[in-house]
Structure formats: C-alpha cells, structure tokens
Amino acid sequence: GLDEVIVVSTFSSEQSDVVPRLGAATAGYLARCLGDQQVLDLSWGSTLLAVVDALAPQNLPELRVVQMLGGLGRLESETYGADLTMRMAQTLGARMRLLPSPGIVSSKLVRDALLEDVNIAETLALAARADLAVVGIGSPIAGSLVTETGILRVSELVELRAMGAVGDIALRFFDGDGQAVDHPVNDRIIGLDLAQIRHIP
C-alpha cells in the first residue's frame, strides 16, 4: 500500500499547469526524504524535468543519483535521462552513476550483449538496490513522449493497448491491475523491470 499521498491542486488539466506543480510537490517531498548514504534512482520525462527544475540546492556528497533506464529520445532533449541525472546530482551536491547504454535497442540479442558489459551490469545492480526512485508514469497513446521522440512506433502502442496496457514506468508497461504487460518490447529495454522497481521502498 501507500505510506503517503500528496495531493496537488491545479487550476486546469493543461500539462503546462499540472507538470510544474507536480514537479514542485515532488521536489518538496525529496527535500524531506533525502539524506547521505542513500541511492536515488531517476528515470526520464517531462515531469522529472520539472522536479529537477524545482529542486533546492543541497549538499549530500554521499548520496548517489543513478540513471535507472538507458538513454531515450534525442540526445539534445532536456528530458534525456543522463542529462536529468547529471543535473539532479549537481543540484543535490551528490555523486552520479550514469547508465552508459541506449534505453531501447533493436533486438533481444543486442540487449543481452550489452547487459554483459560490466559498467552496465554494475549500474543496474546499484539501481536495483536504491532507497528511493523518482519516476514518471507514461500513457500508451499516440502523441505521448515515447512516440514524439521516436522511441516506440504508434503500431507498438496500439499492440500494447490491445494487450491491456494502461501506463508505463521507465518503459515498463503495466495493465489495470498493475501487472507487467508481456510484449516483445520488454526484450529490448536496458533498465530495471517492474519487479525490481516494486522492491524499491
């Protein structure tokens, strides 16, 4: 169950109004929760950009900020996971651990080969032991960030919806009961899976 819920009031349902308020609320929550010796996972997306923008500077030199999903979207994008991880670590005066790989690759064969790299494997192992994770929740609809940035094809989102997908966390799609949707895209992702994410407090 949930230990704490923060309700954010907005004047409209427009993303330009909702996202900054979500970011500020999350940044405030993190200010209460973060401490040295912790591991903080970070995914990617426009909401997480708002969180990073709203964070107040801190000095947490033993905190480690870890990129939990490989790079997605355009390299110059502000919502790119590595950029968000670096910015958050700098703001918090913390150390960072980047995941040196794409977030999604062309095949399971490529994914499996990359997972044998020691740097990738060690980063994912550290991410799996995190004390806290900051993630966005995506929606499998045309026009979402995953299609706008070319990460997934619209046809793949159609397939995912047909299989019951209602959202995703770090590209791991889930159904209305919160269970993982078994789609071939899972075999191409370099990042934590839903089972690992669930074990993060």
Language model: regions and residue ranges:
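Conserved phosphate- and dinucleotide-binding cores of soluble alpha/beta proteins
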Residues: 71-201
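N-terminal active-site beta-alpha-beta segment that forms phosphate/nucleotide-binding
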Residues: 1-108
